[in-house]
C-alpha cells in the first residue's frame, strides 16, 4: 500500500489533488481511497488530505501517519510539527522542491 499525505491551505485544491490521485489509480486498475481531514475551517486555514493506493482492497480508513509521499502546497506550513510528523531524516533527504 502506498500512502500520500497532502498539506495545504483551504482553497488550494488539497482535497481535489487527493481525489484526482485516487481516481487516476482506480482508472489504472488499483484500489484507491482519498479523504480529507478538516473541521469547519475557512479559506486559508490549514487542511490535510490523504490518498491510499493498493493492489488489494483497502480496509483501513485512518489518517496516514507515516506517508510514503508528502506533498506540501504552502511552504509556510513547514513550521507546523504535524506537517513533517512521521518522516525520518532519510525521508527528508529525498525532498524535491519547486518554487514558482
Segments (PLM) and residue ranges:
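Active-site cofactor/cluster-binding pocket
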Residues: 1-100
Amino acid at each position: 500500500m502506498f500512502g500520500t499525505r497532502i498539506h495545504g491551505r483551504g482553497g488550494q485544491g488539497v482535497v481535489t489533488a487527493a481525489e484526482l490521485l485516487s481516481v487516476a489509480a482506480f482508472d489504472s486498475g488499483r484500489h484507491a481511497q482519498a479523504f480529507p481531514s478538516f473541521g469547519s475551517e475557512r479559506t486559508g486555514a490549514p487542511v490535510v488530505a490523504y490518498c491510499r493506493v493498493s493492489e488489494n482492497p483497502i480496509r483501513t480508513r485512518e489518517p496516514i501517519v507515516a506517508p510514503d509521499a508528502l506533498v506540501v502546497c504552502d511552504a509556510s506550513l513547514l513550521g507546523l510539527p504535524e506537517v513533517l510528523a512521521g518522516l525520518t531524516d532519510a525521508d527528508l533527504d529525498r525532498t524535491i522542491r519547486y518554487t514558482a
